[in-house]
């Protein structure tokens, strides 16, 4: 199960599509993509 926006993460693979893991704050943030 993937993590949603602002969900805790250890790597981008933890996050849902279009989200990437912010290594400095350890949460999933939008990666700027739409497709």
UniProtKB/Swiss-Prot annotation:
InterPro entries assigned to the protein according to its UniProt record, in alphabetical order: Huwentoxin-1
Predominant place of localization: secreted
Family: Belongs to the neurotoxin 10 (Hwtx-1) family. 09 (HaTx) subfamily.
Pfam families (UniProt xref): Toxin_12
Secretion signal, residue range per the UniProt entry: none
Domain of life (superkingdom): Eukaryota
Disulfide bonds: 2-16, 9-21, 15-28
Any one GO BP annotation for this protein: envenomation resulting in positive regulation of voltage-gated sodium channel activity in another organism
Tissue: Expressed by the venom gland.
Compartment annotation: Secreted
Note from the entry: Shows poor stability in cerebrospinal fluid and moderate stability in human serum. Half-life of the toxin is about 1.7 hour in cerebrospinal fluid. Half-life of the native toxin is about 10 hours in human serum.
Name recorded for this polypeptide: Delta-theraphotoxin-Hm1a
Main function: Gating-modifier toxin that potently inhibits inactivation of the mammalian Nav1.1/SCN1A sodium channel (EC(50)=38 nM). Also moderately inhibits inactivation of Nav1.2/SCN2A (EC(50)=236 nM) and Nav1.3/SCN3A (EC(50)=220 nM) when the channels are expressed in oocytes without the beta-1 auxiliary subunit. Does not inhibit inactivation of Nav1.2/SCN2A when the channel is coexpressed with the beta-1 auxiliary subunit. When tested on Nav1.1/SCN1A channel, it enhances peak current amplitude and potently delays channel inactivation in a dose-dependent manner, leading to a large sustained current.
Organism: Heteroscodra maculata
Any coiled-coil regions, as ranges: none
